[in-house]
Amino acid sequence: MKNESLTPNPSPKGEGSKMKNQELRTFISAKPMKNENYSNGEGKIYSSFYILHSSLTHAFLLASICVLTALFIPTPLRATDKIKSGGTWNDTSGSFINAHGGQVIFVNGYYYWFGETRKTSVSCYRSTDLMNWTRLADALSPSGSMTDDNKDIASGRNLERPKVAYNAQTNKWVMFIHWENGSDYGQAKVAVAQSDKVQGPYTLVDVFRPNDHDSRDQTIFVDTDGRAYHFGSTNMNTNMLVTLMSDDYLSPTTTETKILQGDKYEAPTIFKVGDTYFGLFSGCTGWDPNAGRLAYTQDIMGEWKHYYDDMQNYSYGENFCKDEGGYTSYTSQSTYVIKVEGKENAYIYMGDRWNSGNVASSKYVWLPLSVRSGYPAVRWYDAWDLSVFDDMYRYKRAKNITDDGEYLLIERRSDRVLSRKNSFTLENDDTTQNVVWNIIKTDNPYEFKLRQVSSGKFLESVFGTMRLQSESDRTAQRWRFVLQEDGYYRIENAEDGKCFTVSGSSTYVGTTVFLNDPDLKNFRSPAHQLFAVYFDSYKHSEYEEADLFSREYREENRRKIEEFELAMSIEAPKASTMDGQRHDPTVVYDIYGRRIADSLSQPLKQGIYIVGSKKYFK
C-alpha cells in the first residue's frame, strides 16, 4: 500500500488537509452505519461499523509510524557556512558528530576528522570546507577479546585521543591511541594500528608502554624530516614524555626525553611554524576545563620554555586564550591544531567541551589561532568562517626600524595593538583606533622619539603619565627600546625610566596601557611590559618582514642584546690599548676592541663603536 504521507504534496498551501477532510467525510457517508453486514470473501461477516473502525485505526497507525520515522531518522541538513563553537554539530545526514579527542588532517582535497566515540571505535568524517562533514565507516573497530596480556582493542576497552600520521617510507598510515583496559586508568599504554588508506580500516599492531613509561593523554608529531615523535603525559601526569618512534612509526626507539617536568600538563597538541615548535596543553583537572598552557622550543628533544608573569603561579604557563572565558580555555580542552590548506599560517584551535556525565555527547570548540605575535593566540568568535584569516596578518613584524617610518606597537601577551580612545588601550585591529607612529632615530641607537602620525604630536612622559605633546628637546620625549630575545622591547622613558605597562596583565580588549617602573624583581622583562614593532603591509609593502620563527632571528637578537648590555656597562677603553697599534683618533673599533674601519666615512652597521676613546652610536 502506498504511504501517501511520504509523498510530496503538490497542492497549494492548506489544500492538502482540505482535500483529505473531504475524502474522509465522503468515506463515512458512503458506509452504512448499522444493520448492514459485509463478507470478506472467506465467509467472515463484518459490520459496516467494524470496517470503518478498522480503516481509521489503520490510517492512524500509518500516520503514527510516519511521525516516529520523522523523529528518529536523521534528515539531511542544509550546508553549513559558519563554525559555531560550543553547540551541537551534525553531519550531512543529520546525525550527531561523535569524534572527540581527535584530529583533522588534509589529504588529497579532503579534510579527515578522526575521533573517539567512547564505544571502543575510532570514527572518521570527511569534508572539503571544514564545516560540512560526511560520516565514513569507522576507521578502527573493536577486534579480539580481552586477554591477560592486554594486546587487543576488544569491545569494552577505552580508546582515547586517536591521532594518525602518514609514513612516507612504508606508504602506510599509522594510528596512535591512548589505551586503557576499560575499568580504570592504570594501564596507561599506547595502541598502534596501521592502514593502507587514510580513512582505514586500521588494524592493530601492538599495545605497549613507551620504554616502560606510563603514557596517558597523547599525540603524535611528524617533523619536516619525516621523523615521528610521540608525546604522552607520564609519571602520573607530572611530566611530558617525548619519544622518537622507529622509522616505520610502529615502535618506540630508546631516544627519549622528559620535558616541562613538574608542570603537570596533559592534552598535548604540537605544531611547528618555521624552526619553532609550539605545544598547547591543559592542566590536570579531570573533566573540568582550566586555563590552557603554552610552551615552545627550537629543539624538539631539548628544553621547552614558557613565559610567566607575576600574576601567575609557577605551575601555570602562558595562557594561549586571550578573551574573557580564556581562564577555562573557553570551556574546552585542547586536542589538536588544524592547518588550513592553501592559507599561510592559518591554524584552528581544536578543543573538546567535555560532558563527564555523557562523554559521547560532549561538544566542540574550534577557533581561529593566530601566530602573528610570534606565539599562538586564540580569540573567541560566536560564529566564523575561513575569511577570518584574510586580514589576520595584515600587520607584520618589522625586521628593521626605518627612520621616520610608520609603525604600530603590538603587545606580546594579548596580540593586540596599542590604540587610543580617551586613553591608551589595547584593541583589536582597527585603523580608526590603532595608533600609527613615526619612530624617529636620535643620536643614541637605542633611543627613539614617537610621533603620532594622525596628530603630529610626540609621546612624552609627563609626571609619569603618557601624554601627546608638541615636539621639544626634553629627554622625556625620548624612549629607550630594550630588546628581548623574541624581538619584543621593553619601552622605557629615557628621563624617568618608566615603561609601557599593561594594567593587571590583562589580555582583554580595552585594557589600559600606562607607565610604570620596570618590574624586574624576578624577571629581566616580564611579559606584561613587552611590545613589538609592526607595520601595515597594505600600506607599506616595501617594508621588510622579520622571520619570527627562524633560528637566525633569535640568534641575531641575542647578539644585539649582548652588545647592548655590554655597551651600557663598559667604559670606553683607551684607544692606545686597542689591537696594539699606535693611537689614531680616526680609527673605528667595535666594543670588543677590534679594528673595524679606518674612519667614520666608511659604511658601518648599526651599533656602538669606539672612536678616539669615545663611544660612537650609529
Predicted regions span which residues?
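Coil residues (strongly favoring Ser/Thr
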Residues: 92, 430-431, 599
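Intrinsically disordered, low-complexity repeat and linker tracts
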Residues: 77, 540-583
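C-terminal outer-membrane/trafficking sorting elements
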Residues: 21-46, 50-53, 57, 562-618
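Residue-level signal for tight coil/turn positions that link beta-strands
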Residues: 101, 108-109, 168-170, 224-225, ...
